[in-house]
């Protein structure tokens, strides 16, 4: 895998670039080419549902559906409890799980009610680690985290790359 970082001020088009990569908005000029088995494909010629199954978007404010922590993580793909725990350890979400009343079986409300924004970001990143996709887009993954947590995000990004994912990190500053 590879790591790419888009750094820029607010309003400079970083998130819009990610939306173009996801096929949500068309580019204002040019085209987006994807490599598939050595061949270049124009994103406009790719069936979007197929493309979306190959990417993961971790936003600043991730959408968390109601259900347990375990259910949310397993919705990314089947894995063992040990794999869940390993992914959570990398992102630091294991400490959050340890503090939850029912641990992995704690029920989350719509939007992740019961978790802070930073905890929701860690949960979404843990989900990305559980089942790495071909393209992982991280929008300000450390926006709501402290410096220690930023190191965990870096470790998660490196693990995604090692799993073969192309990771695009969107950031306002180069610190990450």
Regions found by a protein language model. Name each.
Residues 5, 49, 53-60, 168:
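ABC nucleotide-binding domain signature
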Residues 7-9:
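The feature captures the beta-strand-to-loop junction immediately N-terminal to the Walker
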Residues 12:
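ATP-binding Walker
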Residues 22:
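Helix-to-loop junction immediately C-terminal to a conserved catalytic motif
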